[in-house]
Amino acid sequence: MKIITIESLIKILNKYGFDQYLLDLMQALKRDYGRWQSFTKMPRPSMHVPGGVLELMPICDNATYYTFKYVNCHPKNPLIGQQTVVATGQLSRIDTGYPLMFSEMTILTALRTAANAALATDLMARKDSHILALIGTGAQSEFQVKGLKIVRDIKEVRYFDIDSKAMDKFEKNMRSIGIKLVRCHDAEEAVNGADIITTVTACKANVDVIKNKWVKAGVHINALGGDTVGKTELELSILPRCRVVVEYFDQSFIEGEIQRLNHEEAKKLVYAELYELVNGSKKGRTNDQEITLFDSVGIALEDYSVLCLTYELAKKYNLGEDGNFTPLISDPKNLISALL
């Protein structure tokens, strides 16, 4: 069984290349969204606890693999020097149930979120989109810029965060990327003139991070911060103006921007699930005046894609630690022999 630690993952990314990994991950996501109906999936179960939420994200392809991810969201963790989001995941065979890989998924979650947003943006944003407004410059912000840079010729990033130190960090990390960086005093200033608006905030509340009056015709919005009940980022009146795409309606209705609508309203408003854009049955955009919205909550299929890709690369480069999470015994009915 492969064990992918942070150190192992860094070696894989250094060996393969960060941008190439994101490109291949986008292709893996396309492949897996393209066979959407073959997966057994469910909205993730969650437990709301003091300070945050704990979630499990299982999925099965009904052919080869089953994966799950454990993930949290504790917005106040940075105050004690800890990550807002941490995650681990497992890839298992479905024919025997045996695990093949156990992996860190804090970094993998950021990578798959970036690749998934880039995929949706490629299908929904105007081709001439060059200016990105980024609201929230926390742990996922740099990954988002790197992903979007693959699918659009981003020339300028206008960014804002309520934490000035987070903006300092973002500017330092992005200084050499070859894109004009514009530090803004508030979200309205950042959004002004943007072609793409990406929100990646952590506040566990219904907050109008983006106001309706700021949103102009032709803009594409990636609303990525909504990932649990009671956590949204857009003024509700924005939604009826948009062509709204979600990943998985059953989960988005619980956790996404559309959670504030009743079921009938949400069904009427949502134009498509992302797989329908991937397979070409629906178009992400039909003209340059449309406002498009990717109401993303993050789903288990994305974790499946990133775990499968990482497993293949770990085998290819013989990286990752080998370990036993199951007993190695000659008689499978003699479990106690492992202890004798």
What are these regions, as identified by a protein language model?
Residues 10-15, 229-340:
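Adenosine-phosphate binding glycine-rich loop
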Residues 151-175:
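NAD(P)-binding Rossmann-fold cofactor-contacting core
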Residues 201-203, 225-226:
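Short glycine-/small-residue-rich Rossmann-like dinucleotide-binding loops
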Residues 204-220, 234-236:
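Rossmann-fold NAD(P) dinucleotide-binding segment
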Residues 1-110, 118, 125-128, 301-304, ...:
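N-terminal ligand-binding/catalytic initiation module
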Residues 125-131, 153, 216-217:
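Short helix-loop-beta connector
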Residues 179-194, 209-210:
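Short acidic low-complexity segments
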Residues 137-138:
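Glycine-rich Rossmann-fold phosphate-binding loop(s) that bind the pyrophosphate
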